[in-house]
Swiss-Prot record:
Keywords: ATP-binding, Cytoplasm, DNA-binding, Isomerase, Nucleotide-binding, Topoisomerase. This is DNA gyrase subunit B. Belongs to the type II topoisomerase GyrB family. One of its GO terms (biological process) is DNA topological change. InterPro entries: HATPase_C_sf, Ribosomal_Su5_D2-typ_SF, Ribsml_uS5_D2-typ_fold_subgr, Topo_IIA, Topo_IIA-like_dom_sf, Topo_IIA_B, Topo_IIA_B_C, Topo_IIA_bsu_dom2. The lineage of its organism: Bacteria, Pseudomonadati, Pseudomonadota, Gammaproteobacteria, Moraxellales.
């Protein structure tokens, strides 16, 4: 029999490799009323496992010293350890983890009773949220445990993190697929039942539904299968229906029981759908323009004669007045001048449709020649390799 219902390590070798790569490793095991210990040097046991006392405790202490013969650097980065241990505490509600760095007399205690709901709260700190955190746990018939927490905020990015047996999957997998399917179905059903889609005359996609969403998906699977040794994508087919069914049931009930939250989420989705459509139209307009169109506009781009981007320079100047002075003093062969009027938009905080509808930003995009958007952006088409 296995010692644990579920378990997980990065490569499935755990302490064996730690032992092999350590100059010294010391084990202390508290079990069945006795204290056992064993020590290894460079992977070789120094003596058999022995009993050194009695105890009422249970657990294992592992101490190891990385080998300087193997590693060029043996100094631990406390920030990396803190990030991972905090993550583990969120994923295992009620487990208390203490991190001490005796080099600088530092101690962190991680103890989150709320589990994934506190994980979402931590990620969304400082953001304006649209709903209270939705959080549930469920057990499927095949031994798979599902836990999900989510919340929408007023940002425009999706932030979904997936875990299997406490191991992160940056490429998602079947648990993410099940989550997305249930989320989209639940929201579409709500929008149809409330007659919102007909009223607003918009078509909604899964991307619209996930704009501003922060979510954590954690599954515990007895025998998980991954796409590679590093476990960056879960491929266990039985996980998708387990997550989808649990999420569908719980999330649909949440929307019915929390009408104000559902209304806020629906408003966010409709705004995202409209913005996506406006961005598409604006992108098509920008695509139809060329640098020659802009060159013909008064007070806009004064291009250089050089056609080789590596030898061309673009100077961005504020206003037509500065633009006129710059044009008089430039080297026409290799220096282009682009005057920009008014207060430029902070594109980091602006929604995509607002950014692309800005005349000054549109002028800049067209002048640079790289295009815009995931499908069309190509840095190889940059018309100037020096931009000032």
């Amino acid at each position: 029999d296995n010692s644990y219902k579920v378990s997980g390590g990065l490569h499935g070798v755990g302490v064996s490799v730690v032992n092999a790569l350590s100059s010294k490793l010391h084990l202390t095991i508290y079990r069945a009323g006795q204290i056992h210990e064993q020590e290894y040097h460079h992977g070789d046991p120094q003596y058999p496992l022995r009993v050194i006392g009695e105890t009422d405790n249970t657990g294992t202490t592992v101490r190891f010293w990385p080998s300087a013969e193997t590693f060029s650097q043996t100094i631990f980065n406390v920030e990396i350890l803190a990030r991972r241990l905090r993550e583990l505490s969120f994923l295992n509600a009620g487990v208390r983890i203490v991190l001490r760095d005796e080099r600088i007399n530092l101690e962190h205690v991680y103890d989150y009773e709320g589990g994934l709901s506190e994980f979402v709260k931590y990620i969304n700190e400082g953001k304006n949220h649209l709903n209270e955190i939705f959080h549930f746990t469920a057990d499927a018939d095949n031994g798979i445990a599902v836990e999900v927490a989510l919340q929408w905020n007023d940002s425009y990015q999706e932030n979904v993190r997936c875990f299997t047996n406490n191991i992160p999957q940056k490429d998602g997998g079947t648990h993410l697929a099940g989550f997305r399917a249930a989320l989209t179905r639940g929201l579409n059903q709500y929008l149809e039942n409330e007659n919102i889609l007909k009223k607003e005359k918009v078509n909604v996609t899964g991307d619209d539904a996930r704009e501003g969403l922060t979510a954590i998906i954690s599954v515990k699977v007895p025998d998980p299968k991954f796409s590679s040794q590093t476990k960056e994508k879960l491929v266990s087919s039985e996980v998708k229906p387990a997550v989808e069914q649990a999420m569908n049931k719980e999330f649909s009930a949440y929307l019915l029981e929390n009408p104000q939250a559902a209304k806020s989420i629906a408003g966010k989705i409709i705004d995202a759908a409209r913005a996506r459509d406006a961005a598409r139209k604006a992108r098509e307009m920008t695509r139809r323009k060329s640098a020659l169109d802009i060159a013909g506009l008064p007070g806009k781009l004064a291009d250089c004669q050089e056609k080789d981007p590596a030898l061309s320079e673009l100077y961005l100047v504020e206003g037509d007045s500065a633009g006129g002075s710059a044009k008089q003093g430039r080297n026409r062969k290799m220096q282009a001048i682009l005057p920009l009027k008014g207060k430029i938009l902070n594109v980091e905080r602006a929604r995509f449709d607002k950014m692309i509808s800005s005349q000054e930003v549109g002028t800049l995009i067209t002048a640079l020649g790289c295009g815009i958007g995931r499908e069309e952006y190509n840095p190889d088409k940059l018309r100037y390799h020096k931009i000032i």
